[in-house]
């Protein structure tokens, strides 16, 4: 599920539980490209795509849409009918975007609230050397 105009299928190919079970590090981003109040979610998802181009052989990239019904919201043109995804409640996220770098043991080694640029994420990947 994504509110992105042209979603990158690689960001939706992996499930967090499966990635962690297979001992692969994960770059996980919670955002809503089509409905982001800060207007940074679309660019954040674009950065995930650029990083996936470079690191998808060693890291799983996962985008989680904030809303469970973005298509309905788009069709109706009504933000107020948006229903937050259950995982957003479980992670207790009250803002967006959020990006987490999780190692192969399931430990969050870095987290970023709000927009994070590609250099900061790459620095985290290199510093945490989980590959």
Locations of regions flagged by a protein language model:
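A generic structural signal for alpha->beta connector loops
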Residues: 24, 58-59
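A short acidic/small-residue loop/turn micro-motif
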Residues: 115-118
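Short active-site neighborhood of thiol/selenol oxidoreductases, capturing the structured segment around
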Residues: 2, 8, 15-37
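Thioredoxin-like thiol-disulfide oxidoreductase module
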Residues: 56, 62-96, 101-108, 123-130
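Short gly/ser/thr-rich secondary-structure transition/capping motifs
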Residues: 7-12, 78-82
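Typically the conserved alpha-helix immediately C-terminal to a functionally engaged Cys/Sec
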Residues: 13-14, 38-55
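Extracytoplasmic/periplasmic copper-protein system
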Residues: 1-4, 131
């Amino acid at each position: 599920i994504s509110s992105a105009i042209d979603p990158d299928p690689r960001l939706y190919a992996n499930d967090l539980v499966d990635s962690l079970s297979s001992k692969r590090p994960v770059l996980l981003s919670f955002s809503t490209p089509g409905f982001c109040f800060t207007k940074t979610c679309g660019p954040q998802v674009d950065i995930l795509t650029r990083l996936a181009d470079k690191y998808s052989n060693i890291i799983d990239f996962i985008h989680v849409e904030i809303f469970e019904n973005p298509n309905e919201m788009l069709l109706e043109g009504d933000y107020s009918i948006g229903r937050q995804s259950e995982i957003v409640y479980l992670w207790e996220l009250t803002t967006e975007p959020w990006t987490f770098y999780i190692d192969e043991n399931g430990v969050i080694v870095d987290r970023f609230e709000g927009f994070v640029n590609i250099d900061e994420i790459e620095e985290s990947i290199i510093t945490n050397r989980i590959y």
